[in-house]
Amino acid sequence: MEISLHENITNMKQFFTLVTIGALISSFTVFSSIDEVIAGMNKGNSTEIAKFFDNTVEINMPDKSNSYSKSQGELVLKDFFNSNSVKAFEIIHKGENSGSQYCIGTLLTKNGSFRTTIYMKKKGDKQVLQGITFEK
Protein backbone atom coordinates (compact mmCIF):
# COMPACT_ATOMS: atom_id res chain seq x y z
CA MET A 1 0.00 0.00 0.00
CA GLU A 2 1.49 3.27 -1.12
CA ILE A 3 0.78 6.62 0.55
CA SER A 4 0.81 9.61 -1.76
CA LEU A 5 2.91 12.67 -1.00
CA HIS A 6 -0.28 14.71 -0.57
CA GLU A 7 -1.65 12.30 2.07
CA ASN A 8 1.70 12.30 3.86
CA ILE A 9 1.78 16.11 4.02
CA THR A 10 -1.84 16.20 5.22
CA ASN A 11 -1.04 13.69 7.98
CA MET A 12 2.02 15.73 9.04
CA LYS A 13 -0.07 18.94 9.18
CA GLN A 14 -2.65 17.21 11.38
CA PHE A 15 0.08 15.84 13.65
CA PHE A 16 1.76 19.24 14.11
CA THR A 17 -1.62 20.89 14.71
CA LEU A 18 -2.36 18.40 17.50
CA VAL A 19 1.11 18.86 19.02
CA THR A 20 0.71 22.66 18.96
CA ILE A 21 -2.74 22.50 20.57
CA GLY A 22 -1.41 20.12 23.23
CA ALA A 23 1.50 22.45 24.00
CA LEU A 24 -0.82 25.45 24.30
CA ILE A 25 -3.19 23.61 26.62
CA SER A 26 -0.38 22.34 28.84
CA SER A 27 1.26 25.78 29.08
CA PHE A 28 -2.11 27.26 30.07
CA THR A 29 -2.55 24.58 32.73
CA VAL A 30 0.88 25.25 34.21
CA PHE A 31 0.13 28.91 34.85
CA SER A 32 -3.57 28.70 35.69
CA SER A 33 -3.05 28.37 39.47
CA ILE A 34 -0.67 31.29 39.78
CA ASP A 35 -2.87 33.35 37.46
CA GLU A 36 -5.82 32.76 39.79
CA VAL A 37 -3.70 33.87 42.77
CA ILE A 38 -2.69 37.00 40.82
CA ALA A 39 -6.37 37.70 40.07
CA GLY A 40 -7.07 37.41 43.80
CA MET A 41 -4.22 39.85 44.53
CA ASN A 42 -5.69 42.33 42.03
CA LYS A 43 -8.98 42.27 43.94
CA GLY A 44 -7.46 42.05 47.42
CA ASN A 45 -9.48 38.85 47.85
CA SER A 46 -7.95 36.67 50.59
CA THR A 47 -10.51 33.88 50.05
CA GLU A 48 -9.55 33.43 46.38
CA ILE A 49 -5.86 33.33 47.29
CA ALA A 50 -6.32 31.02 50.30
CA LYS A 51 -7.86 28.33 48.05
CA PHE A 52 -4.29 27.63 46.91
CA PHE A 53 -2.57 27.66 50.34
CA ASP A 54 -0.52 24.61 51.28
CA ASN A 55 -1.22 23.08 54.72
CA THR A 56 0.99 25.85 56.11
CA VAL A 57 1.86 29.09 54.37
CA GLU A 58 4.68 31.55 55.05
CA ILE A 59 3.42 35.16 55.04
CA ASN A 60 5.98 37.93 55.41
CA MET A 61 4.90 41.54 55.91
CA PRO A 62 6.78 44.64 57.00
CA ASP A 63 5.41 44.39 60.57
CA LYS A 64 5.15 40.60 61.03
CA SER A 65 6.28 37.34 59.52
CA ASN A 66 5.20 33.83 60.38
CA SER A 67 4.12 30.44 59.18
CA TYR A 68 0.35 30.00 59.37
CA SER A 69 -2.26 27.28 58.89
CA LYS A 70 -4.60 27.75 55.91
CA SER A 71 -7.36 29.37 57.96
CA GLN A 72 -4.97 31.57 59.99
CA GLY A 73 -3.20 32.61 56.79
CA GLU A 74 -6.46 33.64 55.18
CA LEU A 75 -7.33 35.82 58.21
CA VAL A 76 -3.86 37.42 58.26
CA LEU A 77 -4.14 38.17 54.53
CA LYS A 78 -7.69 39.51 54.94
CA ASP A 79 -6.48 41.79 57.74
CA PHE A 80 -3.61 43.01 55.55
CA PHE A 81 -5.97 43.80 52.65
CA ASN A 82 -8.42 45.56 55.02
CA SER A 83 -5.58 47.78 56.27
CA ASN A 84 -4.13 48.27 52.78
CA SER A 85 -7.00 48.63 50.31
CA VAL A 86 -5.79 47.20 47.00
CA LYS A 87 -5.83 49.33 43.85
CA ALA A 88 -3.98 46.90 41.55
CA PHE A 89 -1.29 44.26 41.26
CA GLU A 90 1.33 44.79 38.56
CA ILE A 91 3.40 41.81 37.45
CA ILE A 92 7.13 42.43 37.12
CA HIS A 93 8.15 38.85 36.40
CA LYS A 94 6.45 35.47 36.37
CA GLY A 95 8.14 32.14 35.82
CA GLU A 96 8.57 28.46 36.52
CA ASN A 97 11.52 26.45 37.79
CA SER A 98 11.53 22.68 38.36
CA GLY A 99 7.74 22.49 38.74
CA SER A 100 7.58 25.52 41.05
CA GLN A 101 5.91 28.77 40.00
CA TYR A 102 6.72 32.25 41.19
CA CYS A 103 5.64 35.79 40.56
CA ILE A 104 7.26 39.06 41.52
CA GLY A 105 5.12 42.16 41.32
CA THR A 106 4.05 45.41 42.88
CA LEU A 107 0.89 45.55 44.97
CA LEU A 108 -0.51 49.07 44.73
CA THR A 109 -2.61 50.07 47.75
CA LYS A 110 -4.07 53.25 49.21
CA ASN A 111 -1.21 53.17 51.74
CA GLY A 112 1.57 52.85 49.16
CA SER A 113 3.13 50.07 47.17
CA PHE A 114 4.55 46.71 48.26
CA ARG A 115 7.03 44.63 46.32
CA THR A 116 5.32 41.24 46.40
CA THR A 117 6.71 37.76 45.84
CA ILE A 118 4.42 34.74 45.43
CA TYR A 119 5.89 31.24 45.58
CA MET A 120 3.99 28.10 44.58
CA LYS A 121 5.18 24.50 44.50
CA LYS A 122 3.83 21.43 42.73
CA LYS A 123 2.33 19.00 45.22
CA GLY A 124 0.85 15.90 43.65
CA ASP A 125 -1.07 17.05 40.60
CA LYS A 126 -1.67 20.67 41.68
CA GLN A 127 0.19 23.85 42.58
CA VAL A 128 0.01 25.01 46.20
CA LEU A 129 0.92 28.42 47.53
CA GLN A 130 3.75 28.15 50.03
CA GLY A 131 4.72 31.76 50.58
CA ILE A 132 3.84 35.41 50.03
CA THR A 133 6.16 38.28 50.89
CA PHE A 134 5.13 41.95 51.01
CA GLU A 135 8.01 44.45 51.25
CA LYS A 136 7.51 48.21 51.67
Give the ranges of each region predicted by the language model.
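Bacterial Sec-dependent N-terminal signal peptides
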Residues: 1-34
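Short, aromatic-enriched amphipathic alpha-helices that serve as compact interaction elements
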Residues: 30-45
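Short solvent-exposed beta->alpha transition segments
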Residues: 53-88
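A structural detector for beta-sheet-dominated domains
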Residues: 60-62, 92, 121, 135
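Surface-exposed, charged secondary-structure patches
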Residues: 75-113
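Short beta-strand edge/turn micro-motifs at domain boundaries
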Residues: 113-136
